[in-house]
Structures are given as C-alpha cells and as structure tokens.
Swiss-Prot record:
Membership in a protein family: Belongs to the TrpB family.
Quaternary organization: Tetramer of two alpha and two beta chains.
Cofactor(s) of this protein: pyridoxal 5'-phosphate
Full protein name: Tryptophan synthase beta chain
Biological pathway: Amino-acid biosynthesis; L-tryptophan biosynthesis; L-tryptophan from chorismate: step 5/5
Keywords attached to this entry: Amino-acid biosynthesis, Aromatic amino acid biosynthesis, Lyase, Pyridoxal phosphate, Tryptophan biosynthesis
EC code: 4.2.1.20
Organism of origin: Prochlorococcus marinus (strain AS9601)
TM stretches of this protein: none
InterPro entries: Trp_synth_b_CS, Trp_synth_beta, Trp_synth_beta/beta-like, TrpB-like_PALP, TrpB-like_PALP_sf
Gene name of the record: trpB
Length: 414
C-alpha cells in the first residue's frame, strides 16, 4: 500500500476549491484539448447544464426521478462487525457505508447518466453514446436511454467484455448496441477514444454521456455536480446518525467520479479528511498498475490536462487493474488539483489487497462490494492503525460485486 500524502502539502485557500475557472481549469488542470468541430458542442453543453440547474422544473424532474426511479436517498449504514474488526487499543474507527450499491443498476453511475440524459433531451439530441470499462456506466446509460426512448451506442474494450460478460448482456437486453473496441489495450482508455471519434463524426445529432469526471470542460464539472447528491446526502445523514460531520471520507479512484461525488460537498469542510484509493495492480513499482496520482505526471488525454501514466516521451502507458472500472491511465483534473494543494490524500492498493478486502467485507457484513469499491475497503488496513482517537469513517460503497463474481471466484479459487 502506497500513500502520496504529507500534512506539509496543505497550502490551499478555500478560494481555490469547488469551481473551475472560466477556462474550465482546476488550478493548472482541465481545459479543452479537442478538435475544433467539438467546441460548439462543448459550449452548447456548458450552457445547457448552467441553464438547467437554474430551471426549477428541471431540478424537480431530476429529483423526482432520483427518488422514484433510481431509489434515492441511499442509506448510510453502520458496519458494526467491520468496526469491531479494526478496533485497536488507541482508537475505535466507526465505519459507515454510503450504500450507492443499492441504486437502480447497482452503482453510483446512474446519478450522472440520468442527469446527462435529461440534458440531452433539452438539447434535442436523440442519439446517445458512452464508453464503459466495468460495464456499470454502460448499463446505467442503456437504462436511461430505454427510459426516455433514446438510441444508445456503448463502446467497450474487448478485454473488458471478457471480464464483464454479465453487464454486456444487460446492456444488450436494455436495447443498446455494444461496439467492441480491439485497438490498443482494448480497455477503458481505448473505448473512450473510440467514443470521442464517434462524437466528432456525429456531433450534430449525438450527445456523449461521459462516465467520469474526466474529459474536456465542462464534463468534469457536469459529472461531479450530478454525483454531488452522494456527498450532500452523506452530510445530512452523518448529522442525523452521530451528530457531526465525518472525520474521514474514503473512496476508490479510477477516473474519479464516485469519489468526487462524495468529496465535493465537503471540500471546504477542512476538518474532514478526503482519501482516494487507486489501483496498484501488481504493485506500483511494476509496469502493471493504474495508480495515476501516485505515480503519474502531467499530460493530456481525452481532451483534458491531468496526471497520467506516461513514459519519458509523453506516450500514454498501459494501465492494469483486476478491476475494469479502475483500469485507466488518467484521472479527473479536479483530483489532480486537490492532490497538488494538499486538500485530498491519495493512496493505492494491489489487486490482492483488494481481493482480500472484498472477501473480508462479504464475510463480516453480508455485502459483496464491487472490485472497485474493494480498493477503498482495503485502505482500512493502512489507515486504522494510524488513528489516535475514535473516528467516524464513511466509505463510498460505489457498487455491488455481482458483475465481478467470476473474476473473484477464479482469483480466490473459490
């Protein structure tokens, strides 16, 4: 397990937080590095999102669907057996789970897919494209397209299709066309590249529902804002459950959408530690990992400047994780900024550590988390021994593990 954080890094002002600049940057990260043909679509999307949040009817419709279709609000659950497991002489880490796995479709992804589908309808776009790695964003996008009668095309890497056959079937059952991407490593990065190529060619009729807080502005802000309901509910539920804000928020980070959704309402609450956990794969000292913040450097990928896994010549390197949803060589620009100014901490755990955590949580709490989520649970082994007082820790349980059972069964020899 590796951590990037030092308390000496905390040199930010609250003015640095929460909103991108007019150029779409968080600090030096973000921006719009795209073909000219996409710029009108990005401007249109930015205006549509800005106007939608000011429209009372849009907000009411979104909230109504989040409640009646998605199943929000999701519970804040006290994991008492996990708490007992990590209790030590110095402190009791009281562990709470924000149950995004209980959303319709089984993960946090539908918060953003639903919101962007409503934006697409406002813009008159009837054709939807999306990329997916673990398949959860693809399923969420296919779901909302079925709900609103929109044509849906999902790009997915051939390698991820092998790992996530259940979600591929779900997407097809929901009426989506799943396009196999064989280029590159045939994973999430390549699926995203193909989706962007499609968008360039069909920008007049098509909206791209990007699935993470990555890509060109305004996507990082739009995706974050639709997921901020996670953190907003968590803040209210913590006050109801134990009478204060949490001490620590913990979430896995690939592109970083579930983490930003949890973190965003708390970034100005400086008493709350924000911890993101990346995929160390076979180890960060090998060439098989996806620990972008831990080991990356500044570069440009998929229309945005952020931290990337790249070689000395600026060529993007392959990422590796047992978790298809974390198998990405970049990260959202806001995460890079929060790391730089010391507001958030980032660590990484290996495939094996994530598998061990998944097994532990399943046995102690009767909850099978997604492999992505298991990376956040694995960080408890590193975090809890360092605590010097009783601490309320909220983990974003970003998805359920049904999709991963074949991978887990073969890896754990069950």
């Amino acid at each position: 397990m590796v951590s990037t954080f030092s308390r000496k890094d905390q040199n930010y002002k609250n003015d640095d937080l929460n909103q991108p600049s007019i150029e779409g940057r968080f600090g030096k990260y973000g921006g719009q590095y795209v073909p000219e043909t996409l710029m009108p679509a990005l401007f249109e999307l930015e205006d549509a999102a800005s106007n939608a949040w000011k429209d009372k009817l849009f907000v009411e419709e979104l909230n109504h669907l989040l409640k009646t279709y998605v199943g929000r609000e999701t519970p804040l659950y006290e994991a008492k057996r996990l708490t007992e497991h990590y209790k030590n002489k110095q402190a009791t880490p009281r562990i709470w789970l924000k149950r995004e796995d209980l959303n319709h479709t089984g993960a946090h992804k539908i918060n953003n897919a639903l919101g962007q589908a409503l934006l697409a309808i406002r813009m008159g776009k009837k054709r939807i494209i999306a990329e997916t790695g673990a398949g959860q964003h693809g399923v969420a996008t296919a779901t909302v397209c079925a709900r609103f009668g929109l044509k849906c095309i999902i790009y997915m890497g051939a390698e991820d299709i092998k790992r996530q056959s259940l979600n591929v079937f779900r997407m097809k059952l929901l009426g989506a066309e799943v396009k196999v991407v064989n280029s590159g490593t045939a994973t999430l990065k390549d699926a995203t590249s193909e989706a962007i190529r499609d968008w360039v060619s069909n920008v007049e009729t098509t909206h791209y529902i990007l699935g993470s807080v990555a890509g060109p502005h305004p996507f990082p802000k739009i995706v974050r804002d639709f997921h901020a309901v996670i953190g907003e509910e968590t803040k209210k539920q913590c006050l109801e459950s134990f009478g204060s804000l949490p001490d620590i928020l913990l979430a896995c980070v690939g592109g970083g959408s579930n983490a930003m959704g949890l973190f965003h309402p708390f970034v100005k609450e400086t008493s709350v530690r924000l911890i993101g956990v990346e995929a160390a794969g076979s180890g960060v000292d090998t060439d098989k990992h996806a620990a972008t913040i831990t080991k990356g450097s500044v570069g440009i990928l998929h229309g945005s400047m952020s931290l990337l896994l790249q070689d000395d010549n600026g060529q993007v390197q392959e990422a590796h994780s047992i978790s298809a949803g974390l198998d990405y060589p970049g990260v959202g620009p806001e995460h890079s900024h929060l790391k730089d100014i010391g507001r958030a901490e980032y660590g990484s755990v290996t495939d094996q550590e994530a598998l061990d955590a998944l097994k532990l949580v399943s046995e102690l709490e009767g909850i099978i988390p997604a492999l992505e989520t298991a990376h956040a649970f694995a960080w408890l082994d590193k975090l809890c021994p360092t605590l010097e007082k009783d601490t309320n820790i909220v983990i974003n349980c970003s998805g359920r593990g049904d999709k991963d059972v074949n991978t887990v069964a073969s890896s754990l020899d069950i």
